[in-house]
């Protein structure tokens, strides 16, 4: 209907161009309504188009439901996201993402530890959001360890490039290149070259510790084996620089016994 009205007005306007000089005095009377009508049509188109995108975005956001993957203590899991990205989740880790992940954005939220093999897509950067920091990548392989409440954030880059930001803004803290490691321990940041990828072998069920404080090892063992470890002698927690490599199937008793040979202590296991 609008188009027919527009064509009718257009025809009247064209006819007026061939009118006499006397009629030309009346042109403004014909032209002004024409301009107002054209403006209405243009406004209607703009409003209609804007309304379409607003409705589309509304439906997109409304239909997006959070998807949550939680891995219990003592277990690991591997998933593949809609864009083909593969994710390995360590014990006591949770990954959350929208049900429409990959359509207009690629955002995931991590509480715990995960290894990512991100499918490359320059138009849709991949973001990992954690309690303290967020990581931005296009397509790469990297590890993130950031358990809520620990005040610790670690990222190891295996391949590609990643940018690291605070969780609250978009000001880049640092950019990691291949084989680089970044950590934020309660506001104290450090960046180093990773000597090896051994400690990333948790994906295979191999736990590798290289110059790790005893307290840090105990914390990981609690997650890996779903146990609660109580230390009666605080002096033990001051032990630093412990190095070792253990298979998951060795069990926590074997690991503690092996460590106690280098740093003597006694332990007991109470079955619940």
Give the ranges of each region predicted by the language model.
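A residue-level detector for the "anchor" residue at the start of short, highly conserved motifs
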Residues: 19-41, 45-272
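A short, acidic loop/turn at secondary-structure junctions
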Residues: 1-25
């Amino acid at each position: 209907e609008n188009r027919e009205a527009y064509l009718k007005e257009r025809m009247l306007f064209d006819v007026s161009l061939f009118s006499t000089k006397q009629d030309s005095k009346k042109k403004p009377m014909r032209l002004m309504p024409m301009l107002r009508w054209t403006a209405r049509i243009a406004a209607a188109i703009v409003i209609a188009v804007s309304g379409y995108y607003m409705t589309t975005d509304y439906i997109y956001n409304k239909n997006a439901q959070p998807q949550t993957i939680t891995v219990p203590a003592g277990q690991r899991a591997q998933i593949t996201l809609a864009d083909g990205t593969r994710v390995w989740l360590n014990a006591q880790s949770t990954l959350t993402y929208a049900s429409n992940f990959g359509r207009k954005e690629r955002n995931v939220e991590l509480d715990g530890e995960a290894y990512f093999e991100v499918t490359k897509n320059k138009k849709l950067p991949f973001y990992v959001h954690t309690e303290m920091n967020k990581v931005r990548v296009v397509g790469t392989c990297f590890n993130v360890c950031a358990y809520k409440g620990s005040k610790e954030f670690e990222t190891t880059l295996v391949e590609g490039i990643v940018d690291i930001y605070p969780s609250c803004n978009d000001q880049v803290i640092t950019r990691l290149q291949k084989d680089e490691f970044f950590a934020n321990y309660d506001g104290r940041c450090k960046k180093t070259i990773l000597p090896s990828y051994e400690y990333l072998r948790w994906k295979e069920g191999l736990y590798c510790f290289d110059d790790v404080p005893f307290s840090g090892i105990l914390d990981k063992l609690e997650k890996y084996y779903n146990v609660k470890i109580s230390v009666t002698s605080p002096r033990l927690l001051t032990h630093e620089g412990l190095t070792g490599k253990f298979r998951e199937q060795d069990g926590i008793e074997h690991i503690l016994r092996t460590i106690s040979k280098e740093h003597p202590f006694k332990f007991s296991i109470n079955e619940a």
